[in-house]
Amino acid sequence: MRTAQVADDDLSYLTYYADNIAAFTDRREAEDGENGFDKTVPLDSVFNILNGNHEKKHYAMQVLDPNAGINYPTDHPVSMDEHFYKTVIQNITECLRGIELDEKYLNSLLSVLEANLSYIPSSTSKKELTDISLYDHVKMTAAIAACTEQFLEEKQEKNYRKHLFENAKQSYEEKMFLLYSMDISGIQNFIYTVGESGVLKGLRARSFYLEIMMEHVVDELLEKLALSRANLIYTGGGHCYMLLPNTKDVKNAIADYEKELNAWMMQQFDTALYVASGYAPASANELRDEPEGSYSGLYLKISKMIAGKKAHRYDAAMIRALNKKRHSGDRECKVCRRMAELADDKCEMCNALEKMSGNVLYDPYFTVVRRKEKNALPLPGEKYLVADTKESLLKRMQQDGYVRSYTCLLYTSPSPR
């Protein structure tokens, strides 16, 4: 970049800066490292050095394939070859031909990269550990770049060369980022609220519904913040972590969204489910744990913020609204025990969950739509969840009410397609 003939506000400076930070966080020297590079080195398991381990397990050359089974780490020799890399390049090239390079296809692009780069090491240096995939490195680079751009935009700073390249060391101390977390309370009680018959089906449907709901909540928030799933670090079990820009607009948006979610939760489930979120401002140096202990300190700050909200769930206005709430029926659902209009002694929600329990086993796609349909499950933001086959999904994607879809073909945790 030092000799590059590009404008001071060129986005390449953002990419260069973000790539350096991502490299700080995922590249560490090996104890017995040597000089040079080895393009045949496979991706090592992250568990090789966990808890003092000294293992040498690594992954086979593979792209993500639902028919190939799980690629478990192995002790057997693995050597990456030119043919595999050419196959990966060809796969990505062919997929890119069918993708428009705009914000609507960002998550599709991420899925393509995940499928092809998940078992390729981000570094082939003999001096470094090779347990971080190229996909994770690229994804983190994109997240950091997006955060940095929004942070500098709020400061009306357009000279990327000066701020991120010439003054890079100083910028590593700026708290450009928010490490953000969201947690749903009450999920265990919700999952185990099942009827006397069809217990396993009920458990499966309720667990799946909460997982899809969390994925939907994450996607809705990222859309509000003009970010992509590159900024999502983890989601599962009613919990998520994201890397967000440290701006006033973002802080206001996540506060408003939390209130919106809890109002919806109260309307749908009374006090059974509650959302609490927290965040900690972070610098690039803190993300790579400089000084030592600063990274874990971020999580401690987040946990304290979330714990404080859980201890004081509702403000006076929400408590008054809860006390004034009128139920639509005068009979008690035999499953969830809430007052509602019933069909077969069950409320609309429990009937829809019962129907969804069969869809979870046999339908590969689950779609978020804007219009309510029969047996559709409600989602925050006046959206609904329905099950689809491949054929019905293709038809639905041409309709105005289509929002997004999730599939479990490749992953335990649904990813948008």
Q: How would you describe each model-predicted region?
A:
Residues 1:
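An active-site-proximal "capping" alpha-helix that borders the catalytic cofactor pocket
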Residues 5-417:
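Regulatory and interdomain segments flanking nucleotide-handling catalytic cores
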